[in-house]
Structures are given as structure tokens and as C-alpha cells.
Amino acid sequence: MGRTLYDKIFDEHVVHTEEDGTAVLYIDRHLVHEVTSPQAFEGLREAGRKVWRVSSIVATADHNTPTTGWERGYDGIADPISKEQIVTLDKNIQESGAAAFFPFLSKRQGIVHVIGPENGATLPGMTVVCGDSHTSTHGAFGALAHGIGTSEVEHVMATQTLLAKKAKNMLVKVNGKVAPGITAKDIVLAIIGKIGTAGGTGYTIEFAGEAIRDLSMEGRMTVCNMAIEAGARAGLVAVDDKTINYVKGRPLAPTGVEWDQAVAYWKTLHSDADAKFDAVVELNAAEIVPQVTWGTSPEMVLGIDAVVPDPDKEKDPSKRGAIERALTYMGLQPGKPMDDIFVDKVFIGSCTNSRIEDMREAAAVVKKLGQKVAKNIKLAMVVPGSGLVKEQAEREGLDAIFKAAGFEWREPGCSMCLAMNADRLEPGERCASTSNRNFEGRQGAGGRTHLVSPAMAAAAAIHGHFVDIRQFA
């Protein structure tokens, strides 16, 4: 019987299988940042161990790094705990001898899930782990990638392996072509809206169908980034020419004979025609409209042409209660049109949507509208995903477009996605955000988050409220 893409990668990395089915899985790439690594490095020291395979590590500071004040260097990091974590990462990586390190203030520093792919550290067929939930991003390359906990970070550092039980296989097919103006973010939010945040629990999801194949590599990264928000362990897209062309020539990609050998293998990284999936979900791409979340979970999402749901129309008591709680927290009334929701702040960034194509998408809307940020917007900020993205955007003049309209153009980092630095919402503030989670307090205590695409966020900044960007497509 044929094998799925997930089966192929998982099986080829099994070192040993226990009687209960738990596998010892070899890990090819270990992405490291400043928040979940200090305890792991300290654990190695206390046990008298060293990092088993230093060359597998790619490290950067991203969660705590400030997006302003870089001219002051490390003194620009206001929070002492944040500063300590960043300094500690510098020391730990230096001590470990890892060469692929992109520290705070360096040209190639950025969000770990942005700098990994752009440096060629993420390759098809790899197993990739990181002490971060959104490691699933790297599945866009036909790699098996998922987040791990701090104790597992230490385990991988010490042994280059991870204990794992094989997940079930889910195929999500997005059939046909999307309408103009519909983005990867809209596609993945529509998927989550359909299957729910528990729909993928126990599964690894392979994303397929014409709409997925049509996406660029950056679009596929956006989709796989949010596989975890559908409850899945990981998300995958089969390798094709787009994958190979994206990787070619990047600093950490193979070259010469090794490149030829790698490409020959990568071309096998797709599910066989007779592969069996445990679950199949299908969406019609033509039916997907610009998406906006209204509640406190990514599954609480609707099209821009919809209205805020009425809990009284929900028959399930638990679901009705969840809707009521979400509406209370979000300060929304049932029946309110989604395009009549005004926002206070706009955040364009995060590991979901901070790459160069995201910057171009948002800037194109701003340029087309030709107006300033609306008066009710307290802050509209654009945070590139890496130093290289920032440089490229500035070469293209995108920063000038944003700044002329009243946006703040910031330094790279995770920023307002999770409010671990100074970028955050105040209680009651409402934000149009291109990030991946709209949980209570995610962007700051009492903050209200609406997840949207970069184009939708840019349009909301100019109009002051959500609008249907299809009219600008």
C-alpha cells in the first residue's frame, strides 16, 4: 500500500521503536531561541553533557527583542528579564560552538521561523523541532516540523533524538482557485473555521489541492504555520518545483553533487497515489472570502460579509456559553456586521505574516488607497520578520509607503504577536493583527485581537475598521 508524505518522513527517521509504539526519532534540524533554551543549556551543564550535534542548531533571539531603540544596543532592552534571556542565549550559543547563530542586532537576526527558511536551514524531508508552537511553519517545505517543550529541547540537544508516537494522517484539500484578493491567511483561517481548533487533534495535516499548489512558498508557510491552531501536531505540503527553486542557492542549502542528490530525493516527497488517509476534508477555494476572527479562538472566524454570531441560535449549551464568553471579552454584540467593527491598533508582522510578500501585499493596499492611517487608529505598526526582509522591503521602497501613510516601520522580532516585549495592547484595545492567536490577553492583558491577512490589516488601518479588500483587488 502507498504511503503518505508524513509516513515517508517519519518512517525514515525512526531509530528505534518501543513495545508501546513510541518511536525514537532522529532530529535533523534544531531551531533555538532565547525563551525556551536557557533551562535546556543549564540542564546540560548540570549533567556534564555537551550538545550532541552542534551543526544541527540554528539560533536567534526573537521573542523578547525590542522593535525600537536598536541604536542603544542591549541598553535598549527595557525589561531586565528579557535582556537577561537574550544575553544568556549569546553566552550559551558561544559556549556550544554553534555557528549558525543570528544574534540580536545582527543583519540576519529575526523570527526563528522566518530566518530558518530564508537561510536554507529548512530543507525538504528534514525533521525540524523548536521550543515554539509554530514550528509547523517549516512543513511548507515537505519537512516534518513541530514544536517541543523545554525538557524536550534539552533531550534533543543531548541525544539528537526525540520520543514520538506516530500521528494519524489527515488530508485537507482546497479545490479550485481562490478569488482575487484572497490570501493564504484567508485559506488557513477558513480551514480552521471549518474543522475547528480540535479538528486536527491527533493528526498531521497534509495540505493539498489546486489552491495550495498555487501558493508561493511564503503562502504555504502561512498555511502550515497555523496547522497547530487546527489542533494538528504538524502541517505539510508536498515538494514541487517551487520548493526546490526557493531553497536553491541559500546559504545553508547543499551545493554541487550534494545538491543533485538532494533534489533527486526531494522529488519523492509526496504522498503516493494509493496512500490512505485517516480523514479527508475538502474546501471549495472559490467560496473563501476575506476572513476575520470575532472571538477568542482562531476557530471563531467569519467572512467579512458576515455578522457577529448570536449565541441564542446555538443549540449546544457548551458552544453557546463559549460564544457568550467570547463576545463579552471582545465587547461585541450579536448581529454586528464584521465590516462595522472599528479597531484601535493594527499589527502587521509575526511568524505567520512578516515575510517580504506580506510586506508587499500590505503596502500595495496602502498605496492603492492613497490615504493616511485613520484618526481613530492609535498605532499602526509594521514589523518585518527578519533583518533581510527589512532590507529587501526598504530597497523596494515599501517602508516609505508605510511611513508616508502614518505607519510605524519597526525592527524585526516577534513583537505584538505575544506581547513579550514593549509592543502590546492596553486593556480594552482592539487590534487588527496578522498573527496566529487571538486568545484572551495574547497581545496584552485585556487586549482584543482580530486575526486577518496583511491586506485586510492594512485596509483596516486606513479606514479605521474592517473592510472587504476584494474591492481593491
UniProtKB/Swiss-Prot annotation:
Gene3D superfamilies: Aconitase, domain 3. It comes from the Bacteria. The keyword Lyase applies. Binds 1 [4Fe-4S] cluster per subunit. Pathway: Amino-acid biosynthesis; L-leucine biosynthesis; L-leucine from 3-methyl-2-oxobutanoate: step 2/4. GO terms for biological process: L-leucine biosynthetic process. Its cofactor is [4Fe-4S] cluster. It is an enzyme of class 4 (lyase). It catalyses: (2R,3S)-3-isopropylmalate = (2S)-2-isopropylmalate. Heterodimer of LeuC and LeuD. Belongs to the aconitase/IPM isomerase family. LeuC type 1 subfamily. NCBIfam families: leuC (TIGR00170), PRK05478.1 (NF004016), PRK12466.1 (NF009116). This is 3-isopropylmalate dehydratase large subunit. It comes from Acidovorax sp. (strain JS42). The lineage of its organism: Bacteria, Pseudomonadati, Pseudomonadota, Betaproteobacteria, Burkholderiales. The gene is leuC.
